[in-house]
Amino acid sequence: MFKKLFGQLQRIGKALMLPVAILPAAGILLAFGNAMHNEQLVEIAPWLKNDIIVMISSVMEAAGQVVFDNLPLLFAVGTALGLAGGDGVAALAALVGYLIMNATMGKVLHITIDDIFSYAKGAKELSQAAKEPAHALVLGIPTLQTGVFGGIIMGALAAWCYNKFYNITLPPFLGFFAGKRFVPIVTSVVAIATGVVLSFAWPPIQDGLNSLSNFLLNKNLTLTTFIFGIIERSLIPFGLHHIFYSPFWFEFGSYTNHAGELVRGDQRIWMAQLKDGVPFTAGAFTTGKYPFMMFGLPAAAFAIYKNARPERKKIVGGLMLSAGLTAFLTGITEPLEFSFLFVAPVLYGIHVLLAGTSFLVMHLLGVKIGMTFSGGFIDYILYGLLNWDRSHALLVIPVGIVYAIVYYFLFDFAIRKFKLKTPGREDEETEIRNSSVAKLPFDVLDAMGGKENIKHLDACITRLRVEVVDKSKVDVAGIKALGASGVLEVGNNMQAIFGPKSDQIKHDMAKIMSGEITKPSETTVTEEMSDEPVHVEALGTTDIYAPGVGQIIPLSEVPDQVFAGKMMGDGVGFIPEKGEIVAPFDGTVKTIFPTKHAIGLESESGVEVLIHIGIDTVKLNGEGFESLINVDEKVTQGQPLMKVNLAYLKAHAPSIVTPMIITNLENKELVIEDVQDADPGKLIMTVK
């Protein structure tokens, strides 16, 4: 029950990222447009008074503001797209449903435009009744004030309607309305019902949200910012932080702008105050990110590099430099945070506490900087330095330097004190047990706690998936010693990364548990040894080309811990734009998984590559895939290997991102080209 709910929350959290991703563009337009009206800047650059420049700046400001004014609609459309696999029909259904829901609430409660205008008049007079209005004018519709929550509710319902009815069959005389055309129709009916229910259910919910907002923001805002920072960072590993911060950014708090309109939410209030040119009172739930993202985490990356083994410093230095620079410039911290989250959780605990104090310190100092993307240098320039007199953004620099020092010394001390296995400090060698191919499944079964400890057994092309009865009986170190490159633990679910042989291990373990095969007896084998030297031909260089038309992304951005953590090997992520996967080099097909979602290839020089089409696509049981080749077949670079129904994958798989992994890199060097747009003729990697 909990795990199912957890999975649904993760999906919702990811869906919310789509509308949030629009905000940086809107924020840039609003910030630059507003800055061009800044009196101090106009004094320095009088040419900004030119009528054409004034018109351009006004258009930019208005273009940015209209996005923030209509966030609920964007959340409705974005949530539907995210939860329905990106299908445009779901977005259309959400748009129609959102309009109908608001119109229904307005009619049921007899809300008129006069009610809205009377509020606007009261807001200008700052009357008590005008501070927390229950009504709003949404796209010209007088209705209840449901904010972004209303958009999310309707978007989720539209996605549910799409997933439920997109392939519905109707009688022949209604055939035109079958399939996806039926989705907006049924969503309209659902929207009417939702509007009626919310007409009576939302007012008490609204009162509760207002009370919670007042309590958090007015009773002890200093403590609230500290707790907010801790919880927000703590939820990063689970992907639930988007759900947590959304009410703070888009609903909690209120401000009446110069037009008499009520603006809700910390981020939206900050943008409204930016446009109005008044002192900032918002930003308590955004400003705290700047010190630890721009200064703290890059310093932590340096501490990790400093403590790496000498022979691994070059590799670790490159990784940490890239991750630290990304955090500093853009505020994207996940590549750096995930580099130590699983191998050294104590460091992440330190990081979480420091993040909480960062929010607290920024609030105590009165620093108020908005953001639309994250707390990196780019947002710092746009929303901090351009408004330094109102935001007090210059204080971020000395505070950030202090945080850099604290992060560095705490990470350095913890790594050495607790002998943490951060990148570059892994054991030189892992003891590998001598287990033959025949004995391996027996040994893995023993390491999992034996037959009685196995509740469910499964596998995909990369990992053995086992649900156990008692996790304490599992010998994780023993599983790694048997050749697993990593073991993930989620509750009582164990995932052992054995690579392409995972499915065979599962198959043999199932037969062992059913009694079909028994443990082989120990046999001593004597081989005749030759005194003749063995000549090994150098493999040389292997060029690896794109497996289709699409986008290349770093492996660290693949939404799967096993691939992103390079447990299977190094490589890249590929986002296909056309439904055809082609051979990346001349070679041989070594493996085609029974569910067709993954292909193993070997080049003529012996380099082994795994192409895993999508994430968790093993669960599709072959639906959406059409294999064009056979095992042991010779293929040439660019030859089609698999036809893929991308629309089906987008609707039924968590992601279509396709990891492309070198599984036998070992002591060879992998050079990844600086490529984003790819096609079958473009070089993306070279193995030397």
Swiss-Prot record:
Pfam families given in the database record: PTS_EIIA_1, PTS_EIIB, PTS_EIIC
Membrane topology: Multi-pass membrane protein
Record's subcellular location: Cell membrane
Main enzyme class: transferase
Membrane-traversing stretches: 12-32, 81-101, 137-157, 182-202, 223-243, 284-304, 315-335, 340-360, 364-384, 395-415
Cellular component terms (Gene Ontology): plasma membrane
PTS EIIB type-1 domain segment(s): 438-519
Domain PTS EIIC type-1: residue ranges: 3-427
EC number(s) reported in the record: 2.7.1.-
Signal sequence coordinates: none
Principal subcellular localization: membrane
GO MF assignments: D-glucose transmembrane transporter activity; kinase activity; protein-N(PI)-phosphohistidine-sugar phosphotransferase activity; protein-phosphocysteine-sugar phosphotransferase activity
PTS EIIA type-1 domain residues: 560-664
Active-site residues, Swiss-Prot/TrEMBL: C460 (phosphocysteine intermediate), H612 (tele-phosphohistidine intermediate)
GO BP, sorted A to Z: D-glucose transmembrane transport; phosphoenolpyruvate-dependent sugar phosphotransferase system
Record keywords, A-Z: Cell membrane, Kinase, Membrane, Phosphotransferase system, Sugar transport, Transferase, Transmembrane, Transmembrane helix, Transport
PANTHER family linked to this entry: CYTOCHROME C-TYPE SYNTHESIS PROTEIN AND PTS TRANSMEMBRANE COMPONENT (PTHR30009), PTS SYSTEM GLUCOSE-SPECIFIC EIICB COMPONENT-RELATED (PTHR30009:SF20)
Entry text on domains: The EIIC domain forms the PTS system translocation channel and contains the specific substrate-binding site. The EIIB domain is phosphorylated by phospho-EIIA on a cysteinyl or histidyl residue, depending on the transported sugar. Then, it transfers the phosphoryl group to the sugar substrate concomitantly with the sugar uptake processed by the EIIC domain.
Function comment: The phosphoenolpyruvate-dependent sugar phosphotransferase system (sugar PTS), a major carbohydrate active -transport system, catalyzes the phosphorylation of incoming sugar substrates concomitantly with their translocation across the cell membrane. This system is involved in alpha- and beta-glucoside transport.
Protein name per its UniProtKB record: PTS system glucoside-specific EIICBA component
Source organism: Staphylococcus aureus (strain MRSA252)
Gene name of the encoded protein: glcB
